[in-house]
Amino acid sequence: MRFNVFSCMLLCSLFCVQAQDNLTMIVGTYTDGGSHGVYSYRFNQMTGEARVLDSLALKNPSYLTLSSDARRLYAVSETNDEKASLNIINIGRNGTMQLLSSAATEGADPCYVAAKGALALTANYSGGSMSVFRLSTKGDEAALATRFLGATGGPDRSRQNVPHVHCACFTPDGRYVLATDFSADRILSYRIAGQRLVANGVATQVSADSGPRHLTFSRDGRFAYLMSELSGKVTAFRYSQGRLESIQEIVSDSVGARGGADIHLSPDGRFLYSSNRLKDEGIAIFSVDAASGLLTRIGYQPTGAHPRQFNLTPNGQFLLCCCRDSNKIQVFRRDTKTGLLTDTHKDISVSRAVCVQFASE
């Protein structure tokens, strides 16, 4: 009897460990090639192995984010017409997906989405705007509440001649939203007031000809890091009450390709990664000083063509990079001590892959 009880306990323990190792991985794509929408996979964050689970037809789901309970997926449809939308998808057991609702962004080419509590946001690149949605109690429907417009003012007359908003994210303190105003070389601030946003001025003005693109925050919320597309630089900031104070600029794109893309911190906050496109494509690697927030460049990992977006597994063991023009997701094993990356050559074949997100099972 003791043996049977012990055996059951051991089996249960092994099952729990295996369950923690497995993630539901959701991939967004552009559908002008061989893809038809969103794909779900089971990804083992200890072995780096992936297995496809389901797919859902959707036009250009180029950016995705999950609800806090991972039951809802928010996906943009990045189109330059009235079909540009925010889509809400149910994520079921075993990665099954069902489209619940869609709402027009009323801003062309939504390329980023964030959701928290009763609000969802899309950054509409060609529309030059940020759309603010109120979510239903169950999180299965979205109603457009308002739009905020970006501006121009940057010196690049071909890339900054009309407004572009590229990213909108909630601050860690839960009180503000920051949006990258690409063409005006600034980051805008909005105060959260219940189910609405109130304009809160300029969080920071960045260097001219930067083209601010994506923003991420340190775990403790004291620092923020910006990847700028045109300058190819990462800017480190101190964050406080909806404002950013620049403390450092450091080069990510060392060849001046003007194709800076995505940016993420490792789960432990000790390393930062930024991707670069168009020339010498790859991911720049930086160490982070925990006390000051300052960065030191320590490496560079070449990738496939056009590394538009990437993400790290929750345990920090792997970095997965969406290489749009190579039609694959590269799987890199990450040394958690040094922060450096090694290509596992376990590529996941996905046509026009541009976004990957993870949820624990």
State what each model feature region is.
Residues 30-32, 78-80, 125-127, 135, ...:
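Short loop/turn segments immediately following the C-termini of beta-strands
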Residues 52-117:
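Blade-loop segments of beta-propeller domains
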